[in-house]
Swiss-Prot record:
It is found in: Membrane. It comes from Rattus norvegicus (Rat). It is an enzyme of class 1 (oxidoreductase). The gene is Cyp20a1. Its cofactor is heme. This is Cytochrome P450 20A1. Belongs to the cytochrome P450 family. It is a single-pass membrane protein.
Amino acid sequence: MLDFAIFAVTFLLALVGAVLYLYPASRQASGIPGLTPTEEKDGNLPDIVNSGSLHEFLVNLHGRYGPVVSFWFGRRLVVSLGTADALKQHFNPNKTLDPFETMLKSLLGYRSGAGSGSEDHVRRRLYGDAVTAALQSNFPLLLKLSEELLDKWLSYPETQHIPLSQHMLGFALKFVTRMVLGDTFEGEQEVIRFQKIHGTVWSEIGKGFLDGSLDKNTTRKNQYQEALMQLEAILKKIIKERKGGDFSQHTFIDSLVQRNLNEQQILEDSVVFSLAGCIVTARLCTWAIHFLTTAEEVQKKLHKEVDHVLGKGPITSEKIEQLRYCQQVLCETVRTAKLTPVSAQLQDIEGKVGPFIIPKETLVLYALGVVLQDASTWPSPHKFDPDRFADEPVMKVFSSLGFSGTWECPELRFAYVVTTVLVSVLLKKLHLLAVDRQVFEMKYELVTSCREETWITVSERH
């Protein structure tokens, strides 16, 4: 069952993957409104490509046909749900699986851990616990790296334009690599080498598999495969060292080793977190700071809370829970940026949403980017308004989508903590300012980014 689920969600990343053609799928009419196939072989793939991204395709499709829609990928029926109410009705099929993690593992070709629902649940819990334990052990390092970035920005003249996305990626990479791998990656050159490998792998996850161009370009495909092998080789070496050594620093790999996972499971989880933990954190930090530069009153209110809770002391893991408005800011950042715009589940058994029957083994997309901009759920959806999350019913809806609470993915939970620490450290000493006349265009992939670099300036608080 898990193998089939992994195959199904691979679609989100490998839209032209020939694997789908290996599984005969029903062409029966589902009765769900939507598109008929544009082409017999590719279904509606040309429509997705012409839309620019899967998210933008779904925005148009739901706008045209309503909250429950259908289309065809190859010869396979796909159903997409585009409102919170539709998602609430459907949330049943495979809740032991983390769609984000599963999508990455399917793309990377990982199949270990495929077992019963209870086994999957245990594996997911162990993975989340390992992230939490490593983060707690490395909290002083997180604070140190945040303060180093603060000092760097303080050294700039007020007119200096800072490439925000670049700095946030570098910051996230430094912390994630050392939290996962230990002091092996303390040196700048090791981080730079890892960043190059990491960038090659992630860029193809976001682009090459999305538009099918990777399979058509032998050079790029070889570079991707070589980078993935290098990434795995680095991690295998570290895993072997951590198993046989006695280290003062507790890492993510140490947490996995202590939980008696086999070497392949440890490798898979380390690769997934090294990739996803870094990118989700970098993008959340980028978007949070970007929105703070464009919302002066929000920044003032957040600075006031940071000053009240922290005073002259440093931020601690205990004080993070007291930064309630900061939590609202980050939730609104995820919503406004549509940070992870699509996830998926496989329909294990025949299901129903409203009057519509969803056939067994249908791939069901959760059009989260559409849901997060639904005016019936979020008044003034395009406005950055953290105060909306002061209302408990709003927070419950957000949690039901998997962005907080029990079902949030470990990578996002990790990113919330890291971003809270960094933003708190920066706001204590700096005003964060936007650069005039920038045009922002979102790039929708597995994790949403800015299509071009985001520039900011800073000035010291007195």
